[in-house]
Amino acid sequence: MKTIIVLSCFFCLAFSQDLSENNNNTATLCLGHHAVPNGTIVKTITDDQIEVTNATELVQSSSTGKICNNPHRILDGRDCTLIDALLGDPHCDVFQDETWDLYVERSKSFSNCYPYDVPDYASLRSLVASSGTLEFITEAFTWTGVTQNGGSGACKRGPGNGFFSRLNWLTKSGSAYPVLNVTMPNNDNFDKLYVWGVHHPSTNQEQTNLYVQASGRVTVSTRRSQQTIIPNIGSRPWVRGQSRRISIYWTIVKPGDILVINSNGNLIAPRGYFKMRTGKSSIMRSDAPIDTCISECITPNGSIPNDKPFQNVNKITYGACPKYIKQSTLKLATGMRNVPEKQTRGLFGAIAGFIENGWEGMIDGWYGFRHQNSEGTGQAADLKSTQAAIDQINGKLNRVIEKTNEKFHQIEKEFSEVEGRIQDLEKYVEDTKIDLWSYNADVLVALENQHTIDLTDSEMNKLFEKTRRQLRENAEDMGNGCFKIYHKCDNACIESIRNGTYDHDIYRDEALNNRFQIKGCGVKSGYKDWILWISFAISCFLLCVVLLGFIMWACQRGNIRCNICI
């Protein structure tokens, strides 16, 4: 019996210790921060995996699947390559004098005129693409003693034989092909592009039938350059019924310079010039459909948004585009360190502060207060510290975009087979640039994430220290982000602490008096829950023993009878 009395007193003492925290003479005030059940993992300088409440994806990994025609002027090449449109292939006549920001070449494009080759195809294609126009000005060249406007069955224009509309095929007149010597000055204030060619017959007989001389020659000169081409007579693989070829060349004539053409045969003469413009027009191979929409950035896969600093859709881009990197995802922390709230807090559901964990459900701020006093419990956000953290984080994404978005385009690189080593070197340089930017992106984002987490932790600590300085000796730091206030603190008192108007002198005497009274017989809070559980278990055990003893005593007295039937 004495044992039961002692344990009952011990249980009551522990129970009264818990209740003493919530009596009318004390209060508990905790500081905490926002938390979510499932956060987002980000990378920092010191930790590859740290959970935050919120993060923004920085890598654009998908396209719209279509090319937007605004704000860039897109010219759909359909079944015409840019060079075919330049030369005037009959099925490309619709592109005469067209302009563009981006010329889109399709995989289905084809040539449908006299078979030709361009020894410096990539340079000519790039030159015309960057000019952004096929504006053509016809000039009055004088070709005396030869037949003009030659045609071929390989280049039908309507029902009859035709030829490239921007070129003039010259052949003998009668039995003569005199030496041609024609000049054309550039008296304008812009560059002029002249496109011309050399015809390569398949046999010597064909050479003399067309040009009389057994071997022709074409020389095109300016003050800055000279090109002399000797035809290569011989049969080639058949293309559209022809084993002959035309080689296409080009010459740029600067303002004040002069074009000189000298030939004794095999000349495919220019009919005029293309007006060259300077700009940032370009060309791209893509089969993505063109649609009415708005996008600053275009890739062969389609347009992509440029609201992210990085993309891994395609290395080839046009417009103001995110930087291409290898990573498929990089997350920028836009929230604080996430510590999900514990679901249980001891036997009596005590509140706890930020040192233990965060608070879920705090929707009106990132930082705040929870209190427990004689009027109950409550919660309120601290908007000042919340706004201070948000202001420092808000500009991060825009700053990263400004550092990385390209305001120019990355064009396709093309080289002929003989320039293989140059192509390999160029590919190595491009791959190295991508590797470097991928590494830079990793470091940049990790640094920004580290800064975000540090500054949000700092705001929490600032709020805690501000509260500590207000309360002074009127409260005790409980070590978990909470203060035990040793005086009666109703809701108005709690509000004064939150808004910074608390006057500790008013409550000083009461707090000192209560502190000594409570500490005189207090049980250390770290062992309270253990004592309560042990006391409860022993009490239950003793209750069972007493009940069993009562049953045995009743059986002996005959008050309870137990019959066992077999």
Swiss-Prot record:
| Residue positions the entry lists as glycosylated | 24, 38, 54, 181, 301, 499
List the S-palmitoyl cysteine lipid attachment residues.
555, 562, 565
Protein family (similarity comment) = Belongs to the influenza viruses hemagglutinin family.
One annotated GO biological process: fusion of virus membrane with host endosome membrane
Q: Would you say which domain of life the source belongs to? A: Viruses
> What is the role of the protein in this entry?
Binds to sialic acid-containing receptors on the cell surface, bringing about the attachment of the virus particle to the cell. This attachment induces virion internalization of about two third of the virus particles through clathrin-dependent endocytosis and about one third through a clathrin- and caveolin-independent pathway. Plays a major role in the determination of host range restriction and virulence. Class I viral fusion protein. Binds to sialic acid-containing receptors on the cell surface, bringing about the attachment of the virus particle to the cell. This attachment induces virion internalization either through clathrin-dependent endocytosis or through clathrin- and caveolin-independent pathway. Plays a major role in the determination of host range restriction and virulence. Class I viral fusion protein. Responsible for penetration of the virus into the cell cytoplasm by mediating the fusion of the membrane of the endocytosed virus particle with the endosomal membrane.
Residues assigned to the Cytoplasmic compartment are: 552-566
Q: Which organism is it from?
A: Influenza A virus (strain A/Mallard/New York/6874/1978 H3N2)
Q: Anything further noted?
A: Major glycoprotein, comprises over 80% of the envelope proteins present in virus particle. The extent of infection into host organism is determined by HA. Influenza viruses bud from the apical surface of polarized epithelial cells (e.g. bronchial epithelial cells) into lumen of lungs and are therefore usually pneumotropic. The reason is that HA is cleaved by tryptase clara which is restricted to lungs. However, HAs of H5 and H7 pantropic avian viruses subtypes can be cleaved by furin and subtilisin-type enzymes, allowing the virus to grow in other organs than lungs.
User: Which Gene Ontology cellular component terms are annotated?
Assistant: host cell plasma membrane; membrane; viral envelope; virion membrane
Residue pairs linked by disulfide bridges in the UniProt entry: 30-482, 68-293, 80-92, 113-155, 297-321, 489-493
Q: Which residues form the signal peptide?
A: 1-16
Query: Gene3D superfamilies annotated for this entry?
Result: 3.90.20.10, 3.90.209.20
Put simply, this protein is called Hemagglutinin
Q: Which SUPFAM superfamilies match?
A: Influenza hemagglutinin (stalk), Viral protein domain
- GO MF annotation list: host cell surface receptor binding
Q: How does it sit in the membrane?
A: Single-pass type I membrane protein
User: Site feature Cleavage: at which residues?
Assistant: 345-346
Q: Which UniProt keywords apply?
A: Clathrin- and caveolin-independent endocytosis of virus by host, Clathrin-mediated endocytosis of virus by host, Disulfide bond, Fusion of virus membrane with host endosomal membrane, Fusion of virus membrane with host membrane, Glycoprotein, Hemagglutinin, Host cell membrane, Host membrane, Host-virus interaction, Lipoprotein, Membrane, Palmitate, Signal, Transmembrane, Transmembrane helix, Viral attachment to host cell, Viral envelope protein, Viral penetration into host cytoplasm, Virion, Virus endocytosis by host, Virus entry into host cell
**Location(s), subcellular:** Virion membrane; Host apical cell membrane
Q: Whom does it interact with, and what assembly results?
A: Homotrimer of disulfide-linked HA1-HA2.
